[in-house]
């Protein structure tokens, strides 16, 4: 599948200073304070008075920063390593991405505790809506002019802002929980949908609208997800997605786990992604520490990541076809997933949540006989994909339910922060494995599947083709697995080689400290994004020179994908919404974190 109107994406240039020159020419060098980081992009602090003007300039500049990739905050009050940075009790960052430049820039603004106010940027990027709501929810920072600034992760009745440093991180620091009848009634009432609060009318000129709760326990909602539909008969007039039911405070947990002990928590972000979740985190930590991993580590990581891309896509394929009415294929795709998990379990020791990647390497070397297991799977799956394509994906009913349904173009996808197959189905050839290679992906031969209609059918077909390309990558890993160590020889990777601990007391002492306290990472900031199973996933880490992260920001692809739903589905039928939800490919743990 190819697109005839694909955007040209230039080679990636880390820490591209061209935009800094443009900003200095427009606003003057004195308007910015540059921050040295290991994020791989320019990081510039601006004054609040100029924030919106600067962001508007970047949105409208030649080869614009069309995507607000991320927006969130940091409680700076306990941060000790801030030399050269503007005084701040809190800060908010705006991570902007330009596909046409293939580069990023981060704009930061400082705030004092007594004046936590910023202008909304929802008029510049529509997807700022949820991000600003989350910043208010987590930090209590107000965004003037926001259309509906309210809780998004926490319940409406929640008190406090959890990502503030003075907010407890442990349940034992709270009073014992009790649910009285009065409190239960209050919680139930707070969940009642109020159309007027969202600018919706209960009546039209000639009709009364019905408001329908789809979820949070509907099978087609794919998790604890609620979407309130405003209906005129079967037609969707408007809708309001409601998330947060699966929120576990993953970013708060990261502040009280050592750099190593947080790895198992990453598995549970996209709980179908397995080690794919480990990868951006360990790469970001390795940037902080300046760790270079052996080539064998890169190849092993890529091989296992592509295995989990396949298992995730197989589950998507089976459940997607099931969503539109065909029951049989899901049993076949789950059988194929089991074959993949047999290989994964043999290599890592676990199935869904191996927590197998390590800072500086992987947990252990490949086991004896791994190559035969991988070879058998590589030979098996292509024939199965051919069968799925012929028997299910060419089915006239499935095509009728999905072709032309829930379509959007590249411009709309970028404005809403859509990545992954949802973006490439519009013809935009942006896959980080090609556009910004990491972990040695530049050494592999594979194609980036594209489509051009941007509808529910194209999103499915792109993922099917991605599985074929993953097989190509795994086959190259099988044929070209390097010799050598499975972890870096670096003092911040644990544990060190056992024979060295038996000979050198300093090595043993260092090992003891790192196991008991955890490794101490240099004070700095780092960032890593990867092409995960559902789109671009990234970790933005702030170290204050300690054994734990000062701030861990987890940006997941499913979050903006759900925010986009109302703009795509208005005017469609309820049945079309079911097909659309299935085509997004999301899990709520990835959305809610």
Swiss-Prot record:
It is found in: Cell inner membrane. It catalyses: a quinone + NADH + 5 H(+)(in) = a quinol + NAD(+) + 4 H(+)(out). Its main location: membrane. The keyword Cell inner membrane applies. Keywords: Cell inner membrane, Cell membrane, Membrane, Multifunctional enzyme, NAD, Quinone, Translocase, Transport, Ubiquinone. The keyword Transport applies. In the N-terminal section; belongs to the complex I 30 kDa subunit family. Residues 208-593 are annotated as: NADH dehydrogenase I subunit D. GO terms for molecular function: NAD binding; NADH dehydrogenase (ubiquinone) activity; NADH:ubiquinone reductase (non-electrogenic) activity; quinone binding. NDH-1 is composed of 13 different subunits. Subunits NuoB, CD, E, F, and G constitute the peripheral sector of the complex. The gene is nuoC. InterPro entries: NADH_DH_suC (IPR010218), NADH_DH_suCD (IPR023062), NADH_Q_OxRdtase_suD (IPR001135), NADH_quin_OxRdtase_su_C/D-like (IPR037232), NADH_UbQ_OxRdtase_30kDa_su (IPR001268), NADH_UbQ_OxRdtase_49kDa_CS (IPR014029), NDH1_su_D/H (IPR022885), NiFe-Hase_large (IPR029014). It comes from the Bacteria. NDH-1 shuttles electrons from NADH, via FMN and iron-sulfur (Fe-S) centers, to quinones in the respiratory chain. The immediate electron acceptor for the enzyme in this species is believed to be ubiquinone. Couples the redox reaction to proton translocation (for every two electrons transferred, four hydrogen ions are translocated across the cytoplasmic membrane), and thus conserves the redox energy in a proton gradient. It is an enzyme of class 7 (translocase). Residues 1-184 are annotated as: NADH dehydrogenase I subunit C. HAMAP family: NDH1_NuoC, NDH1_NuoCD_1, NDH1_NuoD. It is a peripheral membrane protein. One of its GO terms (cellular component) is NADH dehydrogenase complex. Gene3D superfamilies: Cytochrome-c3 Hydrogenase, chain B, NADH:ubiquinone oxidoreductase, 30kDa subunit. This is NADH-quinone oxidoreductase subunit C/D. PROSITE patterns: COMPLEX1_49K (PS00535). Its EC number is 7.1.1.-.
